[in-house]
Amino acid sequence: MAMILVTSQKIREAAENLGQLNRQFKGKTEELTTREQALCQMWEGQAKNAFHGAFERDSRQMEAFHGLVNKYVQVLLEIAQRYEQAEARNAEIAGGRSY
């Protein structure tokens, strides 16, 4: 059976990487919104309204995704912190043992 070793530092690195990617995602969605607004100013009719409605729905989904990824990053950081606290307690207990 394969063994996977994870350290709190690796969890923190993964959280930071994911956070950075999520910030890039947010920037791209903001760029898309700006372009969609500019496009809507040049366009009229039912097709414009349909496109704008679809974009608004997609935009809400992208925002929800961004929020969920942010929450996941926070959970990863909390996991790393709890692991470090447990590790410190265990080291203290082990160091205090005498025979």
Functional labels for PLM-detected ranges:
Residues 1-99:
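Amphipathic alpha-helical hairpins/coiled-coils and adjacent low-complexity
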